[in-house]
Amino acid sequence: MKKISRSVSVSMLVLSVVLAALASAPLMAQDWSMFGADTTNASNNGSSISNSNVSRLAVKWTVTTGGDVSARAAVVANVAYFPDWGGNIWAVDTKTGQVIWSHKLSDYGLPAGTVSRTSPAVQGDKIYLGTQKGAWLLAIKANKGDLVWMTQLETQDPYAIVTTSPAVQGNVVYTGVASQAEGASLFGADLSTAVARGSVVAVSANKGAIQWKTYTVPTGYTGGGVWGSNPVVDPSRNTVYVGTGDNYSHPQLGAPSSKPGVTFQDCILKDTEANCLSPDDHVDSILALDMSSGALKWSRRMVTWNQIYAMNGSDDWNVDCLYGLSQCPSNPGPDYDFGSAPNEITYKDSRGKSHTIIGAGQKSGIYYALDPDTGATLWQTQAGPGSSLGGMEWGSASDGQRIYVAIANYYGLPSAAGSAGSWAALDPATGAILWQVADPNGASDIAPMSVANGVVYAGSLSQNATAPTMLALDATTGHALWNFAPGVSVNAGATIVNDTVYWGSGYSNLGLGTGGNHTFYAFSVGGN
Protein backbone atom coordinates (compact mmCIF):
# COMPACT_ATOMS: atom_id res chain seq x y z
CA MET A 1 0.00 0.00 0.00
CA LYS A 2 1.30 3.42 -0.90
CA LYS A 3 1.96 5.55 2.17
CA ILE A 4 0.99 9.20 2.41
CA SER A 5 3.26 11.30 4.55
CA ARG A 6 1.87 12.89 7.69
CA SER A 7 2.78 16.37 6.43
CA VAL A 8 0.77 15.86 3.24
CA SER A 9 -2.17 14.53 5.24
CA VAL A 10 -2.08 17.56 7.53
CA SER A 11 -1.85 19.89 4.54
CA MET A 12 -4.87 18.28 2.92
CA LEU A 13 -6.79 18.52 6.19
CA VAL A 14 -5.94 22.22 6.50
CA LEU A 15 -6.92 22.80 2.87
CA SER A 16 -10.27 21.05 3.36
CA VAL A 17 -10.98 23.16 6.45
CA VAL A 18 -10.13 26.35 4.57
CA LEU A 19 -12.32 25.40 1.63
CA ALA A 20 -15.20 24.53 3.95
CA ALA A 21 -14.83 27.88 5.68
CA LEU A 22 -14.82 29.71 2.37
CA ALA A 23 -17.94 27.85 1.23
CA SER A 24 -19.86 28.94 4.31
CA ALA A 25 -18.45 32.47 4.51
CA PRO A 26 -20.59 35.47 3.58
CA LEU A 27 -20.26 36.81 0.04
CA MET A 28 -17.44 39.36 -0.23
CA ALA A 29 -18.59 42.91 -0.89
CA GLN A 30 -18.16 44.04 -4.48
CA ASP A 31 -19.64 46.46 -6.99
CA TRP A 32 -23.26 46.07 -8.10
CA SER A 33 -22.84 46.53 -11.84
CA MET A 34 -26.34 45.84 -13.21
CA PHE A 35 -29.93 45.24 -12.08
CA GLY A 36 -29.34 41.86 -10.45
CA ALA A 37 -25.81 42.72 -9.23
CA ASP A 38 -24.27 40.49 -11.90
CA THR A 39 -25.26 38.15 -14.73
CA THR A 40 -26.74 35.56 -12.35
CA ASN A 41 -29.48 38.12 -11.56
CA ALA A 42 -29.46 36.94 -7.93
CA SER A 43 -29.48 40.49 -6.46
CA ASN A 44 -27.04 39.43 -3.75
CA ASN A 45 -23.90 41.07 -2.42
CA GLY A 46 -21.59 41.15 0.56
CA SER A 47 -21.84 44.01 3.05
CA SER A 48 -20.68 45.14 6.48
CA ILE A 49 -24.35 45.78 7.27
CA SER A 50 -25.79 42.76 9.07
CA ASN A 51 -28.82 41.77 11.12
CA SER A 52 -26.95 43.00 14.21
CA ASN A 53 -26.53 46.61 13.05
CA VAL A 54 -29.09 47.20 10.29
CA SER A 55 -31.51 48.64 12.87
CA ARG A 56 -29.20 51.66 13.09
CA LEU A 57 -29.42 52.55 9.39
CA ALA A 58 -29.87 56.29 8.92
CA VAL A 59 -29.83 58.66 5.98
CA LYS A 60 -26.25 59.29 4.84
CA TRP A 61 -27.18 61.66 2.03
CA THR A 62 -29.95 62.28 -0.50
CA VAL A 63 -30.11 63.53 -4.08
CA THR A 64 -33.07 65.54 -5.34
CA THR A 65 -33.99 64.11 -8.74
CA GLY A 66 -36.23 65.22 -11.58
CA GLY A 67 -38.80 62.46 -11.07
CA ASP A 68 -39.64 59.24 -9.27
CA VAL A 69 -36.86 56.65 -9.11
CA SER A 70 -38.11 53.08 -9.60
CA ALA A 71 -34.98 51.67 -11.24
CA ARG A 72 -32.43 50.00 -9.00
CA ALA A 73 -29.12 51.86 -9.11
CA ALA A 74 -25.89 50.36 -10.41
CA VAL A 75 -22.93 51.20 -8.17
CA VAL A 76 -19.41 50.81 -9.54
CA ALA A 77 -16.12 52.43 -8.47
CA ASN A 78 -17.82 54.74 -5.95
CA VAL A 79 -20.37 56.07 -8.44
CA ALA A 80 -24.13 55.37 -8.43
CA TYR A 81 -25.90 55.44 -11.81
CA PHE A 82 -29.69 55.54 -12.14
CA PRO A 83 -32.50 57.07 -14.26
CA ASP A 84 -35.65 58.83 -13.08
CA TRP A 85 -39.17 59.20 -14.45
CA GLY A 86 -38.43 62.82 -15.36
CA GLY A 87 -36.29 61.57 -18.24
CA ASN A 88 -32.91 62.08 -16.56
CA ILE A 89 -29.90 59.85 -16.02
CA TRP A 90 -27.69 60.52 -12.99
CA ALA A 91 -24.14 59.79 -11.86
CA VAL A 92 -23.58 60.46 -8.15
CA ASP A 93 -20.46 60.25 -5.99
CA THR A 94 -21.33 57.57 -3.42
CA LYS A 95 -18.97 59.00 -0.79
CA THR A 96 -20.42 62.51 -0.76
CA GLY A 97 -23.77 62.39 -2.55
CA GLN A 98 -22.56 65.07 -4.95
CA VAL A 99 -23.90 64.87 -8.51
CA ILE A 100 -21.04 64.16 -10.91
CA TRP A 101 -23.24 64.64 -13.96
CA SER A 102 -26.85 64.37 -15.10
CA HIS A 103 -28.41 64.52 -18.55
CA LYS A 104 -31.86 64.46 -20.06
CA LEU A 105 -32.29 61.55 -22.43
CA SER A 106 -33.63 64.10 -24.90
CA ASP A 107 -30.13 65.68 -24.84
CA TYR A 108 -29.01 62.66 -26.86
CA GLY A 109 -31.41 63.42 -29.70
CA LEU A 110 -34.31 61.34 -28.41
CA PRO A 111 -37.83 62.82 -28.36
CA ALA A 112 -38.83 65.08 -25.49
CA GLY A 113 -40.40 63.08 -22.70
CA THR A 114 -38.29 59.96 -23.31
CA VAL A 115 -37.63 58.15 -20.04
CA SER A 116 -35.78 55.07 -18.89
CA ARG A 117 -36.88 52.73 -16.14
CA THR A 118 -34.03 50.26 -16.60
CA SER A 119 -31.12 49.83 -14.25
CA PRO A 120 -27.92 50.79 -16.05
CA ALA A 121 -25.33 48.10 -16.69
CA VAL A 122 -21.77 49.28 -16.16
CA GLN A 123 -18.69 47.83 -17.81
CA GLY A 124 -15.37 49.56 -18.26
CA ASP A 125 -15.84 53.18 -19.24
CA LYS A 126 -19.46 52.83 -20.41
CA ILE A 127 -22.94 52.46 -18.98
CA TYR A 128 -25.83 50.94 -20.93
CA LEU A 129 -29.57 51.53 -20.51
CA GLY A 130 -32.83 51.19 -22.46
CA THR A 131 -35.71 53.59 -23.10
CA GLN A 132 -39.43 53.48 -22.41
CA LYS A 133 -40.16 55.00 -25.82
CA GLY A 134 -38.76 53.80 -29.14
CA ALA A 135 -36.91 50.77 -27.71
CA TRP A 136 -33.52 52.44 -27.85
CA LEU A 137 -30.41 51.01 -26.20
CA LEU A 138 -27.83 53.63 -25.29
CA ALA A 139 -24.14 53.46 -24.43
CA ILE A 140 -22.96 56.46 -22.42
CA LYS A 141 -19.51 57.45 -21.19
CA ALA A 142 -19.40 56.76 -17.47
CA ASN A 143 -17.15 59.69 -16.60
CA LYS A 144 -19.08 62.57 -18.21
CA GLY A 145 -22.31 61.14 -19.57
CA ASP A 146 -21.43 61.71 -23.22
CA LEU A 147 -23.27 59.54 -25.75
CA VAL A 148 -21.16 56.81 -27.36
CA TRP A 149 -23.87 55.19 -29.49
CA MET A 150 -27.57 54.42 -29.50
CA THR A 151 -29.32 51.62 -31.35
CA GLN A 152 -33.04 51.16 -31.96
CA LEU A 153 -33.80 47.53 -31.15
CA GLU A 154 -37.27 47.37 -32.75
CA THR A 155 -38.38 49.45 -35.75
CA GLN A 156 -41.60 47.70 -36.81
CA ASP A 157 -43.59 48.33 -33.62
CA PRO A 158 -44.15 52.04 -32.82
CA TYR A 159 -45.02 51.08 -29.24
CA ALA A 160 -41.86 49.06 -28.58
CA ILE A 161 -40.09 49.68 -25.27
CA VAL A 162 -37.12 48.41 -23.31
CA THR A 163 -37.93 47.78 -19.66
CA THR A 164 -35.56 44.83 -19.33
CA SER A 165 -32.36 46.06 -17.75
CA PRO A 166 -29.33 45.17 -19.86
CA ALA A 167 -26.75 42.57 -18.87
CA VAL A 168 -23.19 42.77 -20.17
CA GLN A 169 -20.97 39.76 -20.66
CA GLY A 170 -17.68 40.13 -22.49
CA ASN A 171 -18.21 42.45 -25.41
CA VAL A 172 -21.97 41.87 -25.72
CA VAL A 173 -24.99 43.59 -24.19
CA TYR A 174 -28.10 41.41 -23.78
CA THR A 175 -31.57 42.83 -23.21
CA GLY A 176 -35.24 42.30 -24.01
CA VAL A 177 -37.96 44.17 -25.88
CA ALA A 178 -41.61 44.54 -24.87
CA SER A 179 -44.40 46.84 -26.08
CA GLN A 180 -46.81 49.46 -24.83
CA ALA A 181 -49.26 48.01 -27.33
CA GLU A 182 -50.29 45.90 -24.34
CA GLY A 183 -51.73 49.18 -23.08
CA ALA A 184 -53.89 49.11 -26.23
CA SER A 185 -56.50 51.86 -26.01
CA LEU A 186 -54.61 53.60 -23.20
CA PHE A 187 -51.71 54.26 -25.57
CA GLY A 188 -53.67 54.52 -28.81
CA ALA A 189 -52.67 51.14 -30.21
CA ASP A 190 -54.90 49.16 -32.55
CA LEU A 191 -54.26 45.51 -31.76
CA SER A 192 -55.96 44.39 -34.97
CA THR A 193 -53.01 45.84 -36.89
CA ALA A 194 -50.33 45.68 -34.21
CA VAL A 195 -46.96 44.10 -34.89
CA ALA A 196 -45.88 44.03 -31.25
CA ARG A 197 -43.63 41.03 -30.67
CA GLY A 198 -41.29 40.51 -27.75
CA SER A 199 -37.68 39.72 -28.44
CA VAL A 200 -34.25 39.13 -26.95
CA VAL A 201 -31.42 41.11 -28.51
CA ALA A 202 -27.62 40.86 -28.37
CA VAL A 203 -25.72 44.04 -29.20
CA SER A 204 -22.02 44.82 -29.59
CA ALA A 205 -20.94 46.68 -26.46
CA ASN A 206 -18.39 48.76 -28.35
CA LYS A 207 -20.22 49.65 -31.56
CA GLY A 208 -23.92 49.12 -30.85
CA ALA A 209 -24.42 46.75 -33.80
CA ILE A 210 -27.15 44.15 -33.35
CA GLN A 211 -25.49 40.73 -33.39
CA TRP A 212 -28.66 38.67 -33.18
CA LYS A 213 -32.33 39.06 -32.37
CA THR A 214 -34.77 36.30 -31.40
CA TYR A 215 -38.53 36.92 -31.40
CA THR A 216 -40.60 35.17 -28.75
CA VAL A 217 -43.81 34.83 -30.81
CA PRO A 218 -44.44 34.11 -34.52
CA THR A 219 -45.43 36.62 -37.18
CA GLY A 220 -49.13 37.44 -36.84
CA TYR A 221 -49.13 37.01 -33.07
CA THR A 222 -48.60 39.81 -30.57
CA GLY A 223 -47.13 39.75 -27.09
CA GLY A 224 -44.42 37.66 -25.52
CA GLY A 225 -42.80 40.77 -24.09
CA VAL A 226 -39.50 40.42 -22.27
CA TRP A 227 -39.84 43.12 -19.65
CA GLY A 228 -38.20 42.70 -16.25
CA SER A 229 -34.84 42.58 -14.40
CA ASN A 230 -31.76 41.57 -16.42
CA PRO A 231 -31.23 38.41 -18.47
CA VAL A 232 -29.22 35.63 -16.88
CA VAL A 233 -26.05 35.07 -18.90
CA ASP A 234 -24.08 31.89 -18.21
CA PRO A 235 -20.87 31.66 -20.27
CA SER A 236 -20.12 28.16 -18.94
CA ARG A 237 -23.28 26.95 -20.66
CA ASN A 238 -23.14 29.52 -23.48
CA THR A 239 -26.73 30.34 -22.57
CA VAL A 240 -28.96 33.36 -21.98
CA TYR A 241 -32.12 32.84 -19.89
CA VAL A 242 -35.18 35.11 -19.98
CA GLY A 243 -38.86 35.08 -19.05
CA THR A 244 -41.71 36.17 -21.31
CA GLY A 245 -45.17 37.69 -20.96
CA ASP A 246 -48.58 36.80 -22.35
CA ASN A 247 -50.11 37.19 -25.80
CA TYR A 248 -51.97 40.43 -26.44
CA SER A 249 -53.86 38.83 -29.33
CA HIS A 250 -53.89 35.77 -31.60
CA PRO A 251 -54.40 35.77 -35.35
CA GLN A 252 -57.32 34.05 -36.97
CA LEU A 253 -56.03 30.58 -37.60
CA GLY A 254 -54.79 29.33 -40.91
CA ALA A 255 -52.20 26.58 -41.22
CA PRO A 256 -51.66 24.34 -39.38
CA SER A 257 -55.32 24.55 -38.36
CA SER A 258 -57.72 22.64 -40.55
CA LYS A 259 -60.23 25.47 -40.12
CA PRO A 260 -58.84 28.70 -41.63
CA GLY A 261 -60.52 31.81 -40.27
CA VAL A 262 -61.53 30.17 -36.98
CA THR A 263 -60.76 32.29 -33.94
CA PHE A 264 -58.28 30.96 -31.44
CA GLN A 265 -60.92 30.81 -28.71
CA ASP A 266 -63.23 28.72 -30.92
CA CYS A 267 -60.38 26.47 -31.94
CA ILE A 268 -59.39 25.40 -28.45
CA LEU A 269 -62.95 24.36 -27.70
CA LYS A 270 -63.25 22.22 -30.83
CA ASP A 271 -59.77 21.22 -31.97
CA THR A 272 -56.47 19.87 -30.69
CA GLU A 273 -53.49 21.49 -29.07
CA ALA A 274 -51.35 20.88 -32.15
CA ASN A 275 -53.82 22.71 -34.38
CA CYS A 276 -54.41 25.64 -32.06
CA LEU A 277 -51.10 26.49 -30.40
CA SER A 278 -48.14 27.49 -32.53
CA PRO A 279 -45.01 25.77 -31.22
CA ASP A 280 -43.23 29.11 -31.66
CA ASP A 281 -45.66 31.08 -29.48
CA HIS A 282 -43.34 31.24 -26.49
CA VAL A 283 -45.53 33.19 -24.08
CA ASP A 284 -45.63 32.84 -20.27
CA SER A 285 -42.39 30.95 -20.76
CA ILE A 286 -38.83 30.57 -19.59
CA LEU A 287 -36.44 30.48 -22.55
CA ALA A 288 -32.85 29.31 -22.87
CA LEU A 289 -31.05 30.82 -25.86
CA ASP A 290 -27.62 30.24 -27.34
CA MET A 291 -25.40 33.19 -26.33
CA SER A 292 -23.61 33.24 -29.67
CA SER A 293 -26.52 32.93 -32.09
CA GLY A 294 -29.78 33.49 -30.20
CA ALA A 295 -30.97 30.04 -31.28
CA LEU A 296 -33.54 28.49 -28.96
CA LYS A 297 -32.14 25.71 -26.80
CA TRP A 298 -35.32 25.03 -24.87
CA SER A 299 -38.59 26.70 -23.92
CA ARG A 300 -40.91 25.92 -21.03
CA ARG A 301 -44.40 27.40 -21.30
CA MET A 302 -45.91 27.58 -17.82
CA VAL A 303 -49.56 28.02 -18.77
CA THR A 304 -50.62 24.53 -19.79
CA TRP A 305 -53.07 23.38 -22.45
CA ASN A 306 -55.45 22.18 -19.74
CA GLN A 307 -55.39 25.62 -18.10
CA ILE A 308 -56.05 27.28 -21.45
CA TYR A 309 -58.94 24.92 -22.16
CA ALA A 310 -60.39 25.57 -18.70
CA MET A 311 -60.26 29.33 -19.39
CA ASN A 312 -62.24 28.96 -22.65
CA GLY A 313 -59.58 31.12 -24.21
CA SER A 314 -55.86 31.66 -23.94
CA ASP A 315 -53.59 33.93 -22.03
CA ASP A 316 -54.58 36.77 -24.36
CA TRP A 317 -54.68 39.88 -22.20
CA ASN A 318 -53.98 43.60 -22.38
CA VAL A 319 -54.37 46.62 -20.12
CA ASP A 320 -57.82 47.35 -21.58
CA CYS A 321 -59.00 44.39 -19.49
CA LEU A 322 -58.27 46.33 -16.29
CA TYR A 323 -60.68 49.07 -17.31
CA GLY A 324 -63.28 47.20 -19.39
CA LEU A 325 -62.20 48.91 -22.62
CA SER A 326 -62.97 47.78 -26.13
CA GLN A 327 -59.81 45.90 -27.07
CA CYS A 328 -59.86 43.47 -24.17
CA PRO A 329 -60.28 39.96 -25.67
CA SER A 330 -63.72 38.40 -25.29
CA ASN A 331 -62.22 35.60 -23.20
CA PRO A 332 -59.19 37.24 -21.58
CA GLY A 333 -56.57 35.09 -19.98
CA PRO A 334 -55.13 35.54 -16.49
CA ASP A 335 -52.08 37.57 -17.63
CA TYR A 336 -49.56 35.17 -16.14
CA ASP A 337 -46.39 36.87 -17.34
CA PHE A 338 -42.93 36.19 -16.11
CA GLY A 339 -42.38 39.79 -15.08
CA SER A 340 -38.68 39.30 -14.61
CA ALA A 341 -35.85 37.20 -15.90
CA PRO A 342 -34.94 34.06 -13.96
CA ASN A 343 -32.39 33.83 -11.16
CA GLU A 344 -29.42 31.52 -11.57
CA ILE A 345 -28.98 30.01 -8.12
CA THR A 346 -26.24 27.73 -6.84
CA TYR A 347 -26.86 26.04 -3.49
CA LYS A 348 -25.34 23.21 -1.48
CA ASP A 349 -27.32 20.15 -0.41
CA SER A 350 -27.02 18.44 2.98
CA ARG A 351 -23.94 16.56 1.76
CA GLY A 352 -22.21 19.74 0.64
CA LYS A 353 -22.70 19.06 -3.07
CA SER A 354 -23.37 22.11 -5.24
CA HIS A 355 -26.41 22.33 -7.52
CA THR A 356 -27.44 25.06 -9.94
CA ILE A 357 -31.04 25.84 -10.82
CA ILE A 358 -32.80 28.37 -13.00
CA GLY A 359 -35.58 29.82 -10.85
CA ALA A 360 -38.32 32.21 -11.90
CA GLY A 361 -41.38 33.76 -10.31
CA GLN A 362 -44.58 34.20 -12.32
CA LYS A 363 -47.61 36.45 -11.88
CA SER A 364 -49.52 33.21 -11.24
CA GLY A 365 -47.88 33.26 -7.80
CA ILE A 366 -45.84 30.16 -8.63
CA TYR A 367 -42.06 30.09 -8.36
CA TYR A 368 -40.46 27.45 -10.62
CA ALA A 369 -37.07 25.77 -10.39
CA LEU A 370 -35.79 24.31 -13.65
CA ASP A 371 -32.78 22.31 -14.75
CA PRO A 372 -30.51 24.83 -16.53
CA ASP A 373 -29.51 22.36 -19.25
CA THR A 374 -32.85 20.75 -20.10
CA GLY A 375 -35.56 23.03 -18.72
CA ALA A 376 -37.07 20.14 -16.77
CA THR A 377 -39.12 21.25 -13.78
CA LEU A 378 -37.37 20.34 -10.52
CA TRP A 379 -40.04 21.82 -8.23
CA GLN A 380 -42.70 24.51 -8.17
CA THR A 381 -44.23 26.37 -5.25
CA GLN A 382 -47.42 28.43 -5.01
CA ALA A 383 -46.04 31.28 -2.93
CA GLY A 384 -49.09 33.54 -3.17
CA PRO A 385 -52.24 34.40 -5.14
CA GLY A 386 -51.98 34.99 -8.87
CA SER A 387 -53.69 37.63 -11.01
CA SER A 388 -52.93 40.32 -13.58
CA LEU A 389 -51.41 42.30 -10.69
CA GLY A 390 -50.48 39.35 -8.53
CA GLY A 391 -47.79 36.79 -7.94
CA MET A 392 -44.21 37.88 -8.49
CA GLU A 393 -43.40 40.78 -10.78
CA TRP A 394 -40.16 42.78 -10.89
CA GLY A 395 -37.68 40.34 -9.41
CA SER A 396 -36.59 37.89 -6.72
CA ALA A 397 -33.25 37.44 -4.96
CA SER A 398 -31.16 34.60 -3.58
CA ASP A 399 -28.07 34.14 -1.43
CA GLY A 400 -27.88 30.40 -2.16
CA GLN A 401 -29.44 29.58 1.21
CA ARG A 402 -32.91 30.87 0.44
CA ILE A 403 -34.85 32.43 -2.45
CA TYR A 404 -36.60 35.67 -1.50
CA VAL A 405 -39.81 36.62 -3.32
CA ALA A 406 -42.27 39.51 -3.20
CA ILE A 407 -45.97 38.71 -3.63
CA ALA A 408 -47.97 41.53 -5.21
CA ASN A 409 -51.57 40.47 -4.43
CA TYR A 410 -52.80 43.89 -5.54
CA TYR A 411 -56.44 42.77 -5.48
CA GLY A 412 -56.29 41.58 -1.87
CA LEU A 413 -57.07 37.92 -2.52
CA PRO A 414 -57.07 35.64 0.54
CA SER A 415 -53.84 33.78 1.21
CA ALA A 416 -51.86 32.23 4.04
CA ALA A 417 -50.21 35.62 4.59
CA GLY A 418 -53.49 37.55 4.61
CA SER A 419 -55.23 39.60 1.96
CA ALA A 420 -52.40 41.93 0.95
CA GLY A 421 -48.86 41.71 -0.34
CA SER A 422 -46.19 39.67 1.40
CA TRP A 423 -42.59 38.51 1.30
CA ALA A 424 -41.43 34.92 1.51
CA ALA A 425 -38.31 32.78 1.59
CA LEU A 426 -38.15 29.45 -0.26
CA ASP A 427 -35.76 26.53 0.11
CA PRO A 428 -33.75 26.36 -3.16
CA ALA A 429 -33.51 22.56 -2.91
CA THR A 430 -37.20 21.78 -2.39
CA GLY A 431 -39.22 24.96 -2.85
CA ALA A 432 -40.59 24.70 0.69
CA ILE A 433 -41.74 28.02 2.12
CA LEU A 434 -39.38 28.68 5.04
CA TRP A 435 -41.11 31.87 6.18
CA GLN A 436 -43.68 34.33 4.90
CA VAL A 437 -44.58 37.73 6.35
CA ALA A 438 -47.35 40.14 5.41
CA ASP A 439 -46.66 43.69 4.29
CA PRO A 440 -47.20 45.64 7.55
CA ASN A 441 -48.88 48.41 5.57
CA GLY A 442 -51.49 46.08 4.08
CA ALA A 443 -50.20 47.06 0.63
CA SER A 444 -49.13 45.36 -2.58
CA ASP A 445 -45.48 44.39 -3.04
CA ILE A 446 -44.02 44.40 -6.53
CA ALA A 447 -40.56 45.86 -5.92
CA PRO A 448 -37.59 43.60 -6.65
CA MET A 449 -35.95 41.96 -3.65
CA SER A 450 -32.32 42.35 -2.57
CA VAL A 451 -30.20 40.43 -0.07
CA ALA A 452 -26.81 41.07 1.54
CA ASN A 453 -25.11 39.47 4.53
CA GLY A 454 -28.22 37.98 6.09
CA VAL A 455 -30.48 40.99 5.51
CA VAL A 456 -33.31 41.13 2.94
CA TYR A 457 -34.43 44.51 1.59
CA ALA A 458 -38.02 44.97 0.40
CA GLY A 459 -40.13 47.86 -0.89
CA SER A 460 -43.85 48.44 -0.30
CA LEU A 461 -46.35 50.01 -2.69
CA SER A 462 -48.33 51.57 0.18
CA GLN A 463 -49.91 54.91 -0.70
CA ASN A 464 -50.01 56.01 2.95
CA ALA A 465 -47.62 58.97 3.24
CA THR A 466 -46.57 57.96 6.76
CA ALA A 467 -46.08 54.26 6.00
CA PRO A 468 -42.61 52.69 6.12
CA THR A 469 -42.19 51.63 2.49
CA MET A 470 -38.51 50.70 2.78
CA LEU A 471 -37.90 47.66 5.00
CA ALA A 472 -35.08 45.35 6.06
CA LEU A 473 -35.93 41.79 7.13
CA ASP A 474 -33.93 39.06 8.81
CA ALA A 475 -33.05 36.59 6.04
CA THR A 476 -33.45 33.61 8.37
CA THR A 477 -36.81 34.46 9.95
CA GLY A 478 -38.42 37.30 7.99
CA HIS A 479 -38.64 39.43 11.14
CA ALA A 480 -38.55 43.17 10.47
CA LEU A 481 -35.24 44.71 11.56
CA TRP A 482 -35.54 48.26 10.20
CA ASN A 483 -37.89 50.48 8.23
CA PHE A 484 -38.02 53.96 6.77
CA ALA A 485 -40.89 56.13 5.54
CA PRO A 486 -39.93 58.25 2.51
CA GLY A 487 -43.52 59.47 2.18
CA VAL A 488 -44.19 57.67 -1.12
CA SER A 489 -44.50 54.18 -2.61
CA VAL A 490 -41.35 52.22 -3.38
CA ASN A 491 -40.93 50.04 -6.46
CA ALA A 492 -37.15 50.24 -6.69
CA GLY A 493 -34.88 47.50 -5.51
CA ALA A 494 -32.18 48.35 -3.00
CA THR A 495 -28.51 48.28 -4.02
CA ILE A 496 -26.11 47.26 -1.26
CA VAL A 497 -22.39 47.91 -1.63
CA ASN A 498 -19.95 47.74 1.29
CA ASP A 499 -21.41 49.82 4.14
CA THR A 500 -24.18 51.63 2.24
CA VAL A 501 -27.69 50.91 0.95
CA TYR A 502 -28.76 52.92 -2.11
CA TRP A 503 -32.49 53.20 -2.79
CA GLY A 504 -34.82 55.13 -5.07
CA SER A 505 -38.33 56.19 -4.09
CA GLY A 506 -41.66 57.02 -5.69
CA TYR A 507 -43.83 55.11 -8.16
CA SER A 508 -47.07 56.35 -9.69
CA ASN A 509 -47.08 54.56 -13.06
CA LEU A 510 -50.63 53.48 -14.02
CA GLY A 511 -51.80 54.88 -10.69
CA LEU A 512 -50.50 51.85 -8.80
CA GLY A 513 -48.66 53.88 -6.17
CA THR A 514 -47.63 57.38 -5.15
CA GLY A 515 -44.67 59.53 -6.03
CA GLY A 516 -43.55 63.11 -6.08
CA ASN A 517 -40.82 63.32 -3.45
CA HIS A 518 -38.14 63.00 -6.18
CA THR A 519 -35.51 61.64 -3.80
CA PHE A 520 -32.74 59.08 -4.08
CA TYR A 521 -31.38 57.86 -0.73
CA ALA A 522 -28.14 56.50 0.66
CA PHE A 523 -28.33 54.83 4.09
CA SER A 524 -25.49 53.71 6.36
CA VAL A 525 -25.17 52.61 9.96
CA GLY A 526 -25.50 55.78 12.01
CA GLY A 527 -25.65 57.83 8.82
CA ASN A 528 -21.85 57.94 8.74
Predicted segments, located by residue:
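Bacterial N-terminal signal peptides
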Residues: S11-S24
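Blade/loop signatures of beta-propeller domains
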Residues: A29-V59
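Repeat-blade elements of multi-bladed beta-propeller folds
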Residues: D31-T39, G66-W90, P111-L137, P158-V200, ...
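A structural motif specific to WD40 beta-propellers
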Residues: A58-K60, Q98-S102, D146-M150, Q211-W212, ...
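Short loop/turn segments that connect beta-strands within beta-propeller blades
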Residues: D93-T96, K141-K144, S204-K207, M291-S293, ...
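Surface-exposed loop and turn segments in beta-propeller and other repeat-based domains
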Residues: K104-P111, Q152-D157, I210-T222, L296-G333, ...
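Generic long, charged, amphipathic alpha-helical segments
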Residues: G418-F484
